[in-house]
């Protein structure tokens, strides 16, 4: 199968994917001692989350908003997290992957409404669910939670893993100096695609394997693999999820990847990889 697109089309696709976002409505329920049900006020915080970014990139602005609410006594060192239908969201996964895996199955034909999430604030009565989602272990000078440092550390670890799969060694990323590594990781927050591509290309010397994660429907199970770059998408899915192939839809960046089934993983990865250099595929049961 030939290349997916021309160079110009490839650049435009990458730009659109980089800037792709999801509308979020975050419900903030403030618990007070005066009311019978324990809830004094409920606030809505509307925002946009980049598909290929991570939930904690939104947290500093959310915290600033919470601090301005009249009924909140917010502690700087209290971490926050988001839940969907009572389940804490794993912030180390891209926002778009969470959306495609958890929300899209019920809204595939109607995605006009924002994704509604519940905000939680850690306290003595509501501990942070560190047994389920990655804890935040860094603090800023003022004692507040340093979400940015946790994101950068997580992304660096992910990049090391994908670098090893791609090159057969993690040396390319280990050879970056400290400022280069920090800049590369921070670009998910600063959103400079050109600079990200420049530094990311420095750690991709050759492609021996493609890092792929397949998220299965109605489960937390994930099929992870280092995949032959020349395998077709349909052959990969037949190999990994043979019983679901005929009754499911593969989703990449919120897009039906059915038309890509006869393309090689190498071509698909080049256009649709996330900033951690992983190709994420969510399996949807229509």
UniProtKB/Swiss-Prot annotation:
Post-translational modification summary for this protein: Conjugated to ATG12; which is essential for autophagy.
Any one GO CC term of the record: autophagosome
Keyword Ubl conjugation applies: yes
Coiled-coil stretches noted in the UniProt entry, renumbered to this chain: none
Keyword Nucleus included in the entry's annotation: no
Gene Ontology process terms (BP): autophagy of mitochondrion; cellular response to nitrogen starvation; piecemeal microautophagy of the nucleus; protein transport
Superkingdom: Eukaryota
GO molecular function, one term: Atg8-family ligase activity
Localization, UniProt: Preautophagosomal structure membrane
Family affiliation: Belongs to the ATG5 family.
Subunit comment: Conjugated with ATG12.
Designated name of the protein: Autophagy protein 5
């Amino acid at each position: 199968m030939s290349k997916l697109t021309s160079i110009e089309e490839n650049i435009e696709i990458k730009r659109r994917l980089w800037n792709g976002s999801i509308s979020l409505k975050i419900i903030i329920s403030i618990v007070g001692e005066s009311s019978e049900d324990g809830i004094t006020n409920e606030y809505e915080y509307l925002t946009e989350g980049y598909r290929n970014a991570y939930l904690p990139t939104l947290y500093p602005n959310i915290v600033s908003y919470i601090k301005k609410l009249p009924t909140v006594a917010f502690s700087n060192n209290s971490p926050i997290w988001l839940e969907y239908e009572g389940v804490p969201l794993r912030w180390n996964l891209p926002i778009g992957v969470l959306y495609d895996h958890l929300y899209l199955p019920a809204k595939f034909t109607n995605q006009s409404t924002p994704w509604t999430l519940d905000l939680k604030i850690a306290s003595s009565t509501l501990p942070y669910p560190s047994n389920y989602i990655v804890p935040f272990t860094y603090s800023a000078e003022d004692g507040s939670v340093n979400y940015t440092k946790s994101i950068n550390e997580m992304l660096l670890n992910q990049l090391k893993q994908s670098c090893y799969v791609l090159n057969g060694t993690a040396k390319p990323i280990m050879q970056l100096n400290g400022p280069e590594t920090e800049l590369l990781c921070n670009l998910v927050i600063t959103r400079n695609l050109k600079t990200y591509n420049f530094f990311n290309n420095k750690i991709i010397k050759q492609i021996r394997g493609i890092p792929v994660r397949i998220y299965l429907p109605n489960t937390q199970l994930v099929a992870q693999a280092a995949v032959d770059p020349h395998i077709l998408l349909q052959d990969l899915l037949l190999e990994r999820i043979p019983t679901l192939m005929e009754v499911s839809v593969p989703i990449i960046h919120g897009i039906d990847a059915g038309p890509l089934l006869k393309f090689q993983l190498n071509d698909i990865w080049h256009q649709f990889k996330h900033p951690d250099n992983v190709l994420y595929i969510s399996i949807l049961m229509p």
